[in-house]
């Protein structure tokens, strides 16, 4: 019997500040060219750097696609590696977006938990990707930055009950090019799907015992 195709949503961000070309969206476009194989329906979206758009768009993407996994990709001017973020944070959003706006409450979800962890074991994903011998270094972080990246991640984790991931990439050429970032994203997402399936298989086995 043929396995049903999995829906995977991957987002990058549009321009903001000094990032007139956002490496995250370039990397996602490279991923789209490569694809994730015949068993995955890949849906990519560019997200404006706007709090209110994120609050509207992220729930809509979850509702539209019912995805197995949503992966958000953002650029960090401080990053020199491709970084897997473990969690999103609810409070502390003071930076103005492209519309010169920030939430009056400075939080994502009123009365939401302080932080939400991804259900994906990022340490396991990092170890698996590292063994593949890519020409890209992959590391782990627990602080996505309290700006639109963190805001988007928390919103998605809240909406998807933890079935989200966030990947920070460096600016283009510092040190990786678009092709390297696209291939790294593909490897990371494939490993995330593997870790997710393994975890769900373990849960299923426990229920049958």
Swiss-Prot record:
SUPFAM superfamilies xrefs: Pyrrolidone carboxyl peptidase (pyroglutamate aminopeptidase)
Locations listed in the record: Cytoplasm
Function text: Removes 5-oxoproline from various penultimate amino acid residues except L-proline.
Keywords of this entry: Cytoplasm, Hydrolase, Protease, Thiol protease
Subunit structure: Monomer.
GO cellular component annotations of the record: cytosol
Gene: Pgpep1
Cited PROSITE patterns: PYRASE_CYS (PS01334), PYRASE_GLU (PS01333)
Active site: 85, 149, 168
Protein name (Swiss-Prot/TrEMBL): Pyroglutamyl-peptidase 1
InterPro entries associated with the record: Peptidase_C15, Peptidase_C15-like, Peptidase_C15-like_sf, PGPEP1_Cys_AS, PGPEP1_Glu_AS
Coarse class of the protein's main subcellular location: cytoplasm
CDD domains registered for this protein in UniProt: Peptidase_C15 (cd00501)
The protein's enzyme class: hydrolase
Gene Ontology terms for molecular function: peptidase activity; pyroglutamyl-peptidase activity
Family label: Belongs to the peptidase C15 family.
UniProt-listed Pfam families: Peptidase_C15
EC numbers on record: 3.4.19.3
Gene Ontology biological process: protein catabolic process; proteolysis
Catalytic activity: Release of an N-terminal pyroglutamyl group from a polypeptide, the second amino acid generally not being Pro
């Amino acid at each position: 019997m043929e396995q049903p195709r999995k829906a995977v949503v991957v987002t990058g961000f549009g321009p903001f500040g000094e990032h007139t070309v956002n490496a995250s969206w370039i990397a996602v476009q490279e991923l789209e060219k490569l694809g994730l194989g015949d068993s995955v329906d890949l849906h990519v979206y560019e997200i404006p750097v706007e709090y209110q758009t994120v609050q509207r768009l992220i729930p809509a993407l979850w509702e539209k696609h019912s995805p197995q996994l949503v992966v958000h990709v953002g650029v960090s001017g401080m990053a020199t590696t491709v970084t897997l973020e473990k969690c999103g944070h609810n409070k502390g959003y003071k930076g103005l977006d492209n519309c010169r706006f920030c939430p009056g409450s400075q939080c994502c979800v009123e009365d939401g938990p302080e932080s939400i962890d991804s259900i994906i074991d990022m340490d396991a994903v990092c170890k698996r990707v590292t063994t593949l011998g890519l020409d890209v270094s992959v590391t782990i972080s627990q602080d996505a930055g309290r700006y639109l990246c963190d805001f988007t991640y928390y919103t998605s984790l809240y909406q998807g009950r933890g079935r989200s991931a966030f990947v920070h990439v460096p600016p283009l050429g510092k040190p990786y090019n678009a092709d390297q970032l696209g291939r790294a994203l593909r490897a990371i997402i494939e490993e995330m799907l593997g870790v997710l399936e393994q975890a769900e298989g373990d849960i299923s086995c426990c229920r049958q015992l």
